[in-house]
Structure formats: C-alpha cells, structure tokens
C-alpha cells in the first residue's frame, strides 16, 4: 500500500537521524568539557559490531546493548586517557582510533563468519517499534513520532536531560566552566580531570549506542564499515547546532532529512544523477558551516586545548 | 660519570629518542597484530616473514612498495605543511582526486606537445587542481571561519561522488565497459626508471617536493612566518606577520602537494582515472605525517613504512591467508602509540635539559 | 628513565634487525615463490600440486558474490588437492600489480572473481604465457586466459517476467550499487524487458545505494520504493541484498534474491533467485586446466540459462500460492530465450 511521500520522508528522516543524535550528543558532551572526540565514527562502528555480536552470542537484545555500552565506555576511556593524561593532539588520537576500530571490527567479523555458516549470522529479533496500530496510521505524527523504536525515544529523553543538566545543575555548570577555562575552574576547586574523563567516557558509550542502533533496530547483521561516515556528520551537526543541545538536536534531524531526501530524489526519478543525490548531506554540511559564520557561539573556549596539571 | 655522558650523547642526538620511540610503536603494533594473527590460527612468525618478503624481499614487491611511496609522500607533505601552520587539512583524499582529475583533463589534450611540455603541463594542472579544492575549504575558513576539519572532510565525499559521476558519464572511455577514462597518451606518461620494476620518475619529483618543502619551511622568510603563525598566532601578529597571507599560501601549497600526488599517480602508474583511484592515500598521509613528526627525514621513513604496510599485508594474505583488515589495525596502533610516545619524548628531552642545568 | 629508554632503543633496533633478517624468502629452499617449499606451513606436499591464486574486489564476507567464489575455491582445493592462495579487496587500481605478483611467484593459475578485472588481466596474461589466467564473467580474453561469462540478462529477464505477472501496482523497484554503470544498466534493461513482455504498462524504478556495506541506507532505499507503491523489490548491492529482502518480507511485498539462492528466506514473498554463481565458472576453469582440455579462449564463452552458467530459480513453495499462469509465462519465456527469440537491448 503506497504511503504518502511526506510520511515516508519524515519517518525515514527520524530513523536516519537517530544514529546522528546519539553520536552528536556524545560528541557534544565531550566538547563541552573541552575535549574533541574525533573517534565518533570508529566508536559507532565498534558499537554496531559489539552490540550485534553480544546479541548473537546471548540471544538477548539487552545484553547486546550492554555489550555496545561497555565497548563504548572502554573506547571512551582510551580516548580520555590518551588525550587528557598525555595532552597530545586530540585530532590525531581520534583518527588513529577510527582506523584501529575499523580494522578491529572487520577482523572480528571475519573471525565470526569463519566460525559460523552464513544463515547463523542473522539476529532473530530486532528492537521493534513500541507503538503500533491506529496511532501509527495518523498522518505525519504517526510516521514521525509513533513508528519509531525505543532507542529513538531514549535519545530524545537524553537530549532533554542533557539540556537540563548543563543549564540547571551545579555539576552541569561546572562542566561548562571546565570547557571554557580549565585553569580557573581548577582554582575554584573543580576537578577538571574528573569532569573531562567522565564526559569523554560517556561520550564513547553514546556513540557506541548510535552504532548499535543500526545493527539492533535497523538491520540484523553487521557489515564492514557500515557506519559510512555517520560519525563525521554528527560532528558537523554539533558545529551547526552551535554547541547547544536544541541546535544540535535539530541539526541532526536536518541531516537525517537530507539523507532521506537523497533517497527520495532517486525514487521520484526526476533525472538527477544518483551521485548528486548522494552528495546532498555533505553539501548541506558545508552550507551549514558557512551559515554559522559570525554567530556568537564558537564552542567552548578551551576546546581542543590540552590542560595539564601544573607539575 | 657514565650517566652524564649518556645524557650528553642523547642531547646531541635527540633523533635517537624519537626514532627509538617510533620503533617501539612499530613493535607494539606488530605485537598486537601478531596476537590477532595467532587467534585465527596462523603462525605469526611465518605471517611476518611473508610481510617482509612481500614488501622488501623481492623485486616485484619492492617495486610495489616504491609505487605506493610516491602518492603517499605527496599526501603526507600536504597534510604536514598545513598542520604546522595550524590548518588541519583532512581533505588530502579529495585534493588527490582533484589533482588527478585536472591532470587527466590536461593529459587528454597533450597528444602533439613535446615530451617535456606534455609531461609537465598535466603535472602543473594537477598541482593547480589540488590547490583549487583546498582553497574552497580555505576560503570558507578565512571568510566564514568555518571549521576546516569538517569542510575538508565533506569535500572528500563530494569529490568522490563527482569522480564517480564523471568517469561513468562525460569522461567515460567509450571503448571499455569499465567506468574509467581513456588511458592518457604515451608521451604524457612519466618514464619508468628501472627494468623489471614499476619505479617511475614521479618518485624523484616527490622527493624534490620533499626537499622543496623543507627548504621553504626552514630557509625562507615565508617559511618562518608559516611556522610562527602555527606555533603562536599572537606573537606572529606582534612580529608583523601577515597571518592571513601566510595562511592562504599554506592552504594552497597543502592542496597543491596532494594534487601533485594525484597527477604523479595518474601519469606514472595508473594512466587512467576511475572511482577508487585513490586507495585511501589522502588519509594515510595524515598517519604518515604524525608518525614522521613532521620532519623531512621522519616523513620519508614513515612513508616507506606505510607503503610497506600496504604491500606487506597483501603478501600476508596471499601467503598464509591473514585477512586484510589487519592493515588498519597495524596502522591504528602505530598512529596511537606514536602520538602517545610524543609525550614521553618530551619528558625525556625535558629531563635531559634539566640534567644539563644541574 | 633515560637508562630504560636507551635500553628500549637498543632492544628495538636489535629486534628490528632480527625481523629484517626474516626478509628472506619464507618459503626458501626450492627457490620458487614464498610458498614454494615445505617450510611454508600450510603448503607442503608434492611438486605436482596445482598452485591456484584467486582474487576478488571487495570483502570475502559479502554474503553473496565473493563469499560464493571463496567457498567454491575452498571446495575445489579440497576436492583436487590444490594449493590455493587468495587476496581480497583488490581495487581496480591494484589489479595489475596483484596479478603480476602471483604470476611471478610461480602460480599455475591466476583467477579473478571480478568481471572488471578482465581488462588488466589480458594485459598481464601477455607477459606470462606459461600461466593460465581466468576471470569470471569476462568480456575480453587472451590465449592463456579462460573466460566464461553469463549472458548477464537471461536470468534477470525471467525474474522480470515473474515480477510482471505478480505485480498489482505495475511498479517494480530495482536497487543496484550505481545506476549508470554498464552492469547496472544491463540489470535494468533485462529486468524491465522481461516485465514489460508480459505487461507493457510496467514501470521499473531504478535507484542506487552508492555503497555495498551501508545496510541501513540500503534498507531505507527499499522503504522508499515500497512506500511509493513498488510491490516487487529486487536488490543487487553487496551486503544490502539480504537486508532488503528481510524488509520486503516484513512489509509483505515480493522480492527476488540476486546472485545466490535465498529462496528459503520466505515461502511467501521470495519469488525466486537469479543465480549466476562465480563458483560454477571457477570450477569449469580449474577442471579445464587440470584435465588439460581447456587452458584458454581468446573470445569469452558466453553461456546462458541453457548452459547452467546462470539460472532463475523459482521459489518452489509458491507453486500452490500463485496462479498457474505465472509459471506458464516463465516456462514460455524460458523456451523463447533458449530458442533465441528474445533479444534485449543492452548498453
């Protein structure tokens, strides 16, 4: 039964933006504390693989999610340890970790597929939509809000929580202070390192969840390099959102919409070469970078600058 | 005292410390790789013997290693020079494509030109092509203060789709089913230098670029300004450095180098443009520059390492069936451990200096 | 601290030198390639063993094309006691190098799983007259190169006929990696021709994923097609195939499997599988070489459904669920193709 173009596009936009949302919230949290997380892409890939792997192993989706989170926490810790403890280039560490995780997940997936035959590599069950029936049939609202799964609702809740946390709580304000001026924060008695470590570690878990969304809710298997640049789009969304939770949230939705539009352009067959259709999200990202020009916020002042305790 | 002598010795030859650390990083990567290879039931020693045999032990393999060396070196130089001035150019991949594209367009129209012009013009076109692409990111940075990490990254994707579009459409070779351009005419190709190996003249052009970049950086006023604005923009401004001018030049040179890589790869090795023409050369350039600590000798050696990694891992798969993703694992571990080792190098050097004061 | 680091440096240099010493031929002794002798672990055995190399573009774990070729080679290795070496992820840019490498390392046969490798293979084959080359679905060949190819359209045509018979919306969806390559256009024109042969009003919507591995994107692509009213979706884009089929089964629309037989995935919604197995062609090459009956053909030997190189396997469990006219149409079209009465305009 044909579904209206609008419903397809919007529902798809939300589905495609959910992984962006997870990774972008993770990236945002880390950047707020003053640390760039450029390993989002690799962490998503790891989350996608380990979420899938543990679900396959145990047959339990919750354990799969847990596996992805544990991977995320560990990889977040590694990034935090290297970039905070040693104060080295956060960009380079991030790129190194992306390369490493791409190799690691591909390697592991080889081991797995060598040990089982093809049909045993599929997950039996995915995290499904919780609202079904008439509610999902309502135009627009049905496709955007109701035909989604638990993880989408979770990330929306997490965004709200993050907004509240960073603006209304003492800890949140301290986190922002650490990202703006670590030296002054330290003087004021805030433990800069603890804030940065925790932010980056949680950031890893969030990125991994974004990857796990792909394998545990969308498709039932893992494919090498299946994240296909989503981590980078997430970083662009943070920039476009000017480091505010609401801005980042809507930027992610915008990128999701662009990806959905890129599909629909092809399906509508209006004579645009498919390569142009596939470029749409990336062109949008560049336009986004230009559009934030001259606006007040340029991200946390101490972003990307290592802070070493006075020895 | 023995200890004092050692300190003095190392102080004079600090490259030993850096080099030692790099070796440790390589060994660590090989250790990690070895354990993983063991996990899949393959003898790691045998696998590594295939690795070295494949990369250095025979003339074909060595030729392949050198073949990869040229484009990798250009990309590494491009990233390195920009990075030193504080411009993170992740767009090597796209600029490499842009260079190859412009070189291919120029080469296609060079049928009757004299050999020197026929070879030189496409190379120049490639240089311009790379510079044009990086200047897009540069303009966005200078005019709109747009984050260059993202803009260069996004331009990579756009460039890849653009190449895919061109080689299956306007530039497609009508006599082939493959999505690729018509091979460039013979006179435009860089001459091969050795019988039995694929070593071509591009190797020396890349080496010349390395020396030129070093000279520009260390021996010219412009280079001094570039370095200063990278290290300390504020003091550069006080010193009367035209920061914007030096940034523009850095961005152009950086893209030009990656573009040069694309042109040399096209004219010396592949002769035709296709999707997947750049097999991650741009990204590997970043790892190489980091590993080489942005010094000419360091970059030279690490390019050799990364080229060998590519060829060696292929040989490991052919020899004993080690899956190719091992390449990324080795590269990742090397990049991470080298960057961590920077911290220790700094500590050791500091302690050496303290030793002198005491 | 300093002492330790110096010690470390010395140690590393020593270790590296030891490793470099390992630079010598790991299969030394016989003086052939790296696996020329018994020392190369997995090899060993008599000198008469045929040494076969096999390469592919993309990864072994694509669950379709390359997986089938790889498994086919493993089976052949066991059956005929071959020494098989493989290299995956060989991009177009490196094909020549890899082929030369194998040929110079003393392999008797060098095979490729990738159609597009045939052009560089012809060039390399000229330099190694004593080596037998072979390429799956090749469209050019050489004297010392075995080249088989499916017609690449007959099975798709039959899939089109079946889809044309079962569609109610007259809209079919086709997903491939790109939409403008020769192979993608072959898929489109044959699938569409088949469908329109039974129902001229049918429209085929052709879209590209641009990726073999972005499963989520492939699935969304199929979602778009289904939502726009396509009631048969046919996907040939690497890893995405099975994912798209799963979605179709879930959404209750018909689907077709490309390359390998996945008819077992559903007894209701999988119409059939268009099979063109690399393993079939690889077997023909290896057996030809072993028996000495076939070691090269300058013009590729093209075989279709009649020769078993390609096939459209109808899902048997649909026999009692669909109208008999569907199967009659397929049988009729099959007979017409074999009789040579069907032509499809190919790119």
What do these predicted regions represent?
Chain C
Residues 1-11:
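Bacterial N-terminal signal peptides that target proteins for export
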Residues 13-16:
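Hydrophobic alpha-helical membrane-embedded or membrane-associated segments
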Residues 18-22:
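C-terminal motif of bacterial Sec signal peptides marking the signal peptidase cleavage site
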Residues 23-347:
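A residue-level marker of the well-folded mature domains of exported/periplasmic proteins
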């Amino acid at each position: 039964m044909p579904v209206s173009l609008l419903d397809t596009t919007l529902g798809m936009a939300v589905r495609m933006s959910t992984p962006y949302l997870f990774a972008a919230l993770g990236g945002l949290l880390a950047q707020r504390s003053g640390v760039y997380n450029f390993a989002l892409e690799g962490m998503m890939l790891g989350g996608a693989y380990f979420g899938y792997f543990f679900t396959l192993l145990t047959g339990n989706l919750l354990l799969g999610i847990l596996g992805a989170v544990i991977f995320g926490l560990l990889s977040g810790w590694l990034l935090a340890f290297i970039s905070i403890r040693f104060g080295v280039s956060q960009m380079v560490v991030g790129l190194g970790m992306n390369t490493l995780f791409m190799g690691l997940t591909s390697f592991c997936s080889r081991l797995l597929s060598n040990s089982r035959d093809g049909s045993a590599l599929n997950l039996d069950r995915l995290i499904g939509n919780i609202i079904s029936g008439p509610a999902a049939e309502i135009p627009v609202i049905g496709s955007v809000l109701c035909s989604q799964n638990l993880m989408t609702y979770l990330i929306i809740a997490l965004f709200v929580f993050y907004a509240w946390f960073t603006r209304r709580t003492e800890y949140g304000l301290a986190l922002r202070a650490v990202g703006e001026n670590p030296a002054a924060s330290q003087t004021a008695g805030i433990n800069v390192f603890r804030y940065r470590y925790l932010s980056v570690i949680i950031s890893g878990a969030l990125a991994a969840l974004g990857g796990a969304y792909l394998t545990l809710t969308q498709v039932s298997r893992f494919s090498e390099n299946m994240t296909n640049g989503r981590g980078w789009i997430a970083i662009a969304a943070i920039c476009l959102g000017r480091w505010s939770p609401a801005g980042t949230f809507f930027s992610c939705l915008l990128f999701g919409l662009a990806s959905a539009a890129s599909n629909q352009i092809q399906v509508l067959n209006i004579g645009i070469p498919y390569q142009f259709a596939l470029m749409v999200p990336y062109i949008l990202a560049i336009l986004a970078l230009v559009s934030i020009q001259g606006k007040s916020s340029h991200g946390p002042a101490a972003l990307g600058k290592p802070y070493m305790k006075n020895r | 005292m023995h200890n004092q002598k050692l300190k003095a010795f190392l102080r004079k030859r600090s490259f030993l410390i850096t080099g030692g650390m790099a070796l440790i990083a390589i060994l660590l990567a090989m250790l990690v790789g070895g354990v993983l290879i063991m996990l899949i039931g393959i003898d790691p020693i045998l696998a590594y013997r295939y690795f070295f045999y494949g990369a250095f032990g025979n003339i074909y393999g060595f030729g392949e290693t050198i073949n990869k060396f040229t484009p990798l070196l250009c990309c590494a130089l491009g990233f390195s020079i920009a990075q030193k001035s504080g411009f993170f150019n992740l767009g090597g991949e796209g600029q490499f494509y842009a260079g190859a594209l412009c070189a291919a367009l120029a080469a296609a129209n060079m049928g009757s030109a004299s050999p020197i012009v026929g070879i030189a013009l496409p190379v120049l076109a490639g240089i311009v092509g790379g510079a044009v692409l990086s200047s897009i990111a540069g303009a966005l940075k200078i005019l709109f203060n747009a984050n260059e990490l993202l803009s260069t990254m996004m331009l990579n994707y756009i460039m890849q789709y653009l190449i895919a579009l061109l080689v299956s459409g306007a530039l497609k070779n009508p006599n082939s089913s493959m999505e690729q351009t018509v091979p460039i005419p013979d006179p435009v190709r860089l001459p091969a230098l050795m019988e039995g190996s694929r070593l071509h003249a591009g190797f020396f052009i890349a080496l010349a670029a390395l020396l030129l970049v070093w000279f520009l950086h260390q021996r010219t006023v412009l280079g001094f300004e570039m370095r200063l604005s990278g290290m300390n923009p504020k003091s550069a401004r006080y010193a009367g450095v035209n920061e914007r001018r030096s940034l523009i030049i850095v961005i152009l040179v950086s893209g030009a180098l990656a573009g040069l890589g694309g042109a040399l790869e096209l004219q010396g090795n592949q002769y035709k443009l296709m999707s997947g023409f750049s097999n991650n050369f741009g990204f590997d350039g970043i790892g190489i520059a980091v590993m080489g600590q942005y010094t000419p000798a360091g970059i030279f050696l690490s390019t050799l390492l990364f080229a060998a990694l590519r060829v060696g891992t292929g040989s490991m798969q052919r020899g004993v069936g080690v899956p190719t993703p091992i390449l990324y694992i080795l590269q990742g571990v090397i990049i991470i451990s080298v960057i961590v080792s920077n911290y220790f190098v700094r500590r050791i050097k500091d302690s050496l200096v303290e030793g002198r004061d005491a | 601290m300093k002492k330790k680091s110096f010690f470390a440096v010395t140690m590393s240099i020593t270790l590296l030198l030891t490793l470099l010493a390992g630079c010598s031929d790991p299969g030394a002794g016989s003086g052939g390639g790296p696996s020329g002798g018994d020392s190369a672990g997995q090899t060993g055995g008599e000198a008469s063993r045929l040494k076969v190399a096999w390469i592919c573009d993309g990864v072994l774990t694509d669950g379709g094309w390359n997986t089938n070729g790889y498994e086919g080679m493993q089976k052949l290795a066991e059956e005929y006691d071959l020494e098989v070496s493989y290299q995956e992820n060989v991009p177009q840019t490196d094909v020549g190098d890899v082929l030369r490498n194998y040929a110079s390392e003393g392999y008797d046969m060098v095979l490729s799983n990738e159609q597009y490798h045939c052009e560089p293979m012809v060039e390399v084959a000229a330099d190694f007259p004593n080596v037998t080359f072979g390429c799956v679905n090749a469209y050019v060949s050489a004297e010392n190169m075995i080249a088989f190819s499916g017609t690449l359209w007959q099975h798709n045509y039959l899939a089109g006929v079946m889809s044309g018979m079962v569609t109610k919306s007259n809209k079919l969806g086709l997903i491939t990696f790109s939409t403008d390559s020769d192979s993608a256009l072959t898929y489109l024109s044959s699938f569409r021709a088949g469908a329109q042969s039974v129902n001229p009003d049918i429209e085929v919507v052709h879209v590209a994923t641009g990726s073999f591995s972005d499963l989520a994107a492939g699935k969304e692509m199929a979602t778009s097609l289904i939502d726009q009213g396509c009631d048969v979706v046919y996907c040939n884009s690497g890893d995405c195939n099975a994912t798209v089929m799963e979605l179709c089964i879930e959404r209750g629309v018909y689907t077709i499997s490309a390359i390998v037989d996945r008819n077992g995935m559903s007894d209701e919604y999988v119409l059939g599988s268009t099979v063109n197995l690399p393993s079939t062609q690889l077997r023909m090459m290896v057996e030809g070489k072993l028996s000495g009956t076939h070691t090269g053909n300058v013009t590729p030997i093209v075989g279709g459904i009649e020769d078993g190189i390609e096939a459209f396997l109808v899902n048997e469990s649909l026999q009692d669920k669909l109208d008999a006219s569907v199967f009659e149409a397929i049988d009729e079209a099959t007979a017409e193709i074999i009789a040579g009465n069907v032509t499809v305009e190919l790119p």
